[in-house]
Amino acid sequence: MKITLITVGKVKEKYLRDAIAEYSKRLGRYCKLGIVEVADEKTPEHASDGLERQIKAKEGERIAKHIRDDAFVIALAIEGKQLTSEQLAAKINDLGLHGTSHIQLIIGGSLGLDPAILKRADYLLSFSKMTFPHQLMRVILLEQIYRAYKINAGEPYHK
C-alpha cells in the first residue's frame, strides 16, 4: 500500500520534524510513505472572509495538482467522521482488501481546506472538534497510521 500525505506549509520546529522522521521510518515496514508539501499563503492577522476564501482556493489549487485519480483521498476536516484507532485500522485494511493501492491524506493549512478539495475527497476524517496546528497534525496522523498498521498486524503497541 502506498500512503501519501499532502500537506500545506513546511514543518518549522525540529522536534516535530524529528517525530515525523521517526514515524516515517517505522512505517517503512508496512507501506510506502510519501509526504508532499505545498506552499502555504501568508494570512494577515485580521483577514476578511473573502481573503480567507482566496487563500484557501490558492492552497487548494496547489493540493489538487498532487491528487491522483487512482488514489482514495481522505481529507482531514473538523466536519469529518471521527474514528477510533481500531476503526481507522479497519478502514485502511478494508481499502486494501477492496483493491485500493494508494491512499492520499490531505492536511490543510491554518485556515483549513478549500471546499473543492473537501468535495473531491472520498472520505472526510476528523480527529476532534478542536483545531490543531497543522504541523502537529502531521505527527498525530502519522502516529495513527502507524498504530493502524500495528493493530492490523496483530502486533503489540496500541494498548
Curated annotation (Swiss-Prot):
Its EC number is 2.1.1.177. One of its GO terms (molecular function) is rRNA (pseudouridine-N3-)-methyltransferase activity. One of its GO terms (cellular component) is cytoplasm. It is found in: Cytoplasm. It catalyses: pseudouridine(1915) in 23S rRNA + S-adenosyl-L-methionine = N(3)-methylpseudouridine(1915) in 23S rRNA + S-adenosyl-L-homocysteine + H(+). Keywords: Cytoplasm, Methyltransferase, rRNA processing, S-adenosyl-L-methionine, Transferase. S-adenosyl-L-methionine binds at residues 76, 108, 127-132. Pfam families: SPOUT_MTase (PF02590). It comes from the Bacteria. It is an enzyme of class 2 (transferase). InterPro entries: Alpha/beta_knot_MTases, RlmH-like, tRNA_m1G_MTases_N. Homodimer. Specifically methylates the pseudouridine at position 1915 (m3Psi1915) in 23S rRNA. Belongs to the RNA methyltransferase RlmH family. This is Ribosomal RNA large subunit methyltransferase H. The lineage of its organism: Bacteria, Bacillati, Actinomycetota, Actinomycetes, Bifidobacteriales.
